[in-house]
């Protein structure tokens, strides 16, 4: 295993939220993806698209961060990496069986336009697996909220209901959803790690992942810091 693979594993998998977040989306997608063409929208270095590729998918990752993609090409399971805008995807209609997007839509000025493009390139019956910032209690801690939004360029936040409406308008039916960091304590943890720790903080807090997961299982699936959704194109 190359050093770049070790660094990518540590950055993506040893992480208090990404491990569960992207791992859940991939679990929903399925273990056997042979014969499937999968697009990761705003996939950075393509690590998670690469994990879909390991399951047999013909995986493609798009992003505008050239440096991340240059790094991604050094990974052992690198997908096809294409530099392009998520709001203007360079693919024909119905090109993909599944679309993955991990906490990307909140960074777009026009989240609806990004969903337009995802729906366009998705085959009928194909599915979207995505997550988004919710920050349902963020107004309780305005300094943490504002710092998080400024640090990560969060333009909008979404709930499963607001995503359901946007998706329905684009011919997509919500199949299921799941909130993460559902309790007040874990939501504050999420914002505090974001504000004061950044990526290093999220990585260092990885040992807390089982405790956050346990708290989530005991709380209603109604609110949280992040929402995961699966939707199917009509």
Predicted regions and their residues:
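A short SAM/SAH-binding and catalytic strip from SAM-dependent methyltransferases
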Residues: 98-109
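A C-terminal cap/extension of S-adenosyl-L-methionine-dependent methyltransferases
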Residues: 143, 176-234
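A short glycine-rich, Lys/Arg-flanked "PGG" loop and its adjoining helix->strand segment in the class I
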Residues: 112-127
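Conserved N-terminal segment of class I S-adenosyl-L-methionine
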Residues: 1-88, 100, 115, 224-227
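Short, glycine-/aromatic-enriched active-site segment of Class I SAM-dependent methyltransferases
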Residues: 133-154
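Short N-terminal helix/helix-N-cap motif within the alpha/beta-hydrolase-1
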Residues: 108-113, 139-140
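Short alpha-helix
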Residues: 155-171, 177
